Amino acid sequence: MSEDLSMKCGLEIHVQVDTNSKLFCQCPTNYKDVEPNTNICPVCIGHPGAKPMPPNKKAIDMAIMVAKMLGCEMVIDKDIYFQRKHYNYPDLPSGYQKTSVPIGEHGKFLGVGITEVHLEEDPGQYKPDLGTVDYNRSGTPLIEIVTDPDMKSPEEAREFLRQLLRLFRYIGNLRGEGTMRADTNISIKYNGIQGNRVEVKNVNSIRGVYKVLKYELIRQKNVLRRGGEIKLETRAFMESQMITKGMRSKETADDYRYIPDPDLQPIVLSNEWVEKVEAQMPETPMNKEKRFVEQYGIKEDDAKVLVSDLELADVFEKVVAELGNDKDGISLAVTWIRNELKRVLVYNKLEFFETNLKPEHMVELINSIKDKTISQKIGKTIIEQMVEYKGEKTPKELINEMGLTVIEDTSELEKACEEAIKNSDKAIEDYKSGNQRALNSVVGQVMKLTRGRAEPATVVEILKKKIDG
């Protein structure tokens, strides 16, 4: 019997704004490299009578930018007030979280509806196993992005988050994966039976969201298949086991007892304010991909790979400009940045910014290949060494240290070719019988004997002269 199974998924994504001070006080937002409970004050630990400052303007500007880049309609000339969202948990010292009403609404990103974008304060960090709370994080500005339940598979949700985090890197001033947290909302329909919505709280990675949705899809299907009922509930993600466990029945808005915060004046966004933020907005990854294809004439797949890493895309443009911005320069930049450099980065699990390489390093390497100082094979070795040394050594320094310049002495090349011919009887026989490709095996032998320092075209020329007589 075939199964009729479908799912709906929506996400609530929380991303920290990289500000110097917290949302409602002047305490630093650094909470990772300091002793617990040192970057705190009466405001961020909820002392009675402590009054918050007006919200951090940079945090508001970043929320506006995120909302605009997600295609939201901005809430203009209306009161955007902060509410008190009440719940009891050790990481929330005041007993409520200050969270704004929407700043932007009704957006769309990658075909997924964006319900709203708003600002709120991050709670502290509670460690139940130790019974300790660190309030250094309490009050750090958070932007929350709430999506419509438009995602139909774990894979779609994973790709949505990947592209969203890429957008955050382009925007800047946002702390991405590692500090991002997502609440997943999932419901399924199985053989005509509709299950209730289940929320899984505080999943802190793209991989985690994917695993949660895969697990819940199977768990909920099995419950319905056995004739059970999916509870409307909130569940916790047990990351070490990659499973979810029930926490409590799902809250409603009434359970949080929202009230306007009497200590904070409403924000009123004007068209001028939004336009000023818009003027500072960067090019989106999607627009950059399109421009790369149109401006440089490169393939869509190449543009997608380059744009996936903001720094890599910037290096590509700078290298192309240095190489003359012509067809040959573009082709070389694609080969050595999109293909070779990206290969080495993926192998070493690095982003470009972690290598300390500069555009001029890539220009120097490519020029060394263009002017035949080194062969393409050696170029691949040098790029691996450049990444390994984290930019401490230039391509020329590495070439000289390793003695990898192209062999220009014809007699040395001829000796290597003669030795390769002696050891390649079968390939020579096949070549003489008309199999031109058999010569590649002999060329490979020469490259091995010369440690890649021979120019392949020169080797082919010498081999043909010696074999053909």
Swiss-Prot record:
GO terms for molecular function: asparaginyl-tRNA synthase (glutamine-hydrolyzing) activity; ATP binding; glutaminyl-tRNA synthase (glutamine-hydrolyzing) activity. This is Aspartyl/glutamyl-tRNA(Asn/Gln) amidotransferase subunit B. Signal peptide: none annotated. It catalyses: L-glutamyl-tRNA(Gln) + L-glutamine + ATP + H2O = L-glutaminyl-tRNA(Gln) + L-glutamate + ADP + phosphate + H(+); L-aspartyl-tRNA(Asn) + L-glutamine + ATP + H2O = L-asparaginyl-tRNA(Asn) + L-glutamate + ADP + phosphate + 2 H(+). Heterotrimer of A, B and C subunits. The gene is gatB. Its EC number is 6.3.5.-. It comes from Methanococcus maripaludis (strain C6 / ATCC BAA-1332). Keywords: ATP-binding, Ligase, Nucleotide-binding, Protein biosynthesis. GO terms for biological process: glutaminyl-tRNAGln biosynthesis via transamidation; translation. Belongs to the GatB/GatE family. GatB subfamily. Pfam families: GatB_N, GatB_Yqey. Allows the formation of correctly charged Asn-tRNA(Asn) or Gln-tRNA(Gln) through the transamidation of misacylated Asp-tRNA(Asn) or Glu-tRNA(Gln) in organisms which lack either or both of asparaginyl-tRNA or glutaminyl-tRNA synthetases. The reaction takes place in the presence of glutamine and ATP through an activated phospho-Asp-tRNA(Asn) or phospho-Glu-tRNA(Gln).
